[in-house]
Amino acid sequence: APAESNPGNYHGVSKFDLTGIPDPEVAPAESFSNAFGRTLSAAGNTDKTLCAITAAMKYGTGLQFFSHAHPERFFDVGMAEQHAVTFAAGLASKGMLPVVCIYSTFLQRSYDQIIHDVNLLHENVVFAVDRAGFVPGDGETHQGIYDPAFLSQTGMPIYSPSNYEELRHWLPILLSHEMQGPRAIRYPRGGESKALAKYGCSGKEYDKLI
């Protein structure tokens, strides 16, 4: 069956042919998740300490690129967000640079671990917060509206790129070993706003949109 042979793509589906006849392949539109995933995978080519952790959200967070390129440094712990964060803290304590990629609404499950296992110990863990902000199409359970509150912790910067250019600029900086301690980057589901793509910043200049 198509869903059994390709469970990732059938995790969440729109309308499709019930007979299983595949539609003509169409190149998927770019998204924040895929822009993140490609940038992270490219960084993994040169930094062998870089690893990615998710909780049953490989395709949703764009980690299929990293998992294919660096399978030995990709970890899917299943639906266990608390364990994902504690596992990341352990890897960081041994010199690795773990990137925890979880939807905003599910990352709140690991609030205690973020504080006690990562931040209080000042471990080098990067949190990639997908589905941040209002999330269309996924229903009430997937709204990412609380992470600005529970990630606002002492010594933990939060980056929120408004377009792909900003994401590609800031992510390598967050992955630099010159940064110390936990840090987070949050981005919405789907694609960038055309207005923000036009007026977004390069990291050196900031524009105010009204």
Set out the residue ranges of the language-model regions.
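Thiamine diphosphate
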Residues: 1-182, 191-193, 203-205
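Membrane-interfacial segments at transmembrane helix termini in multi-pass membrane proteins
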Residues: 187-192, 198
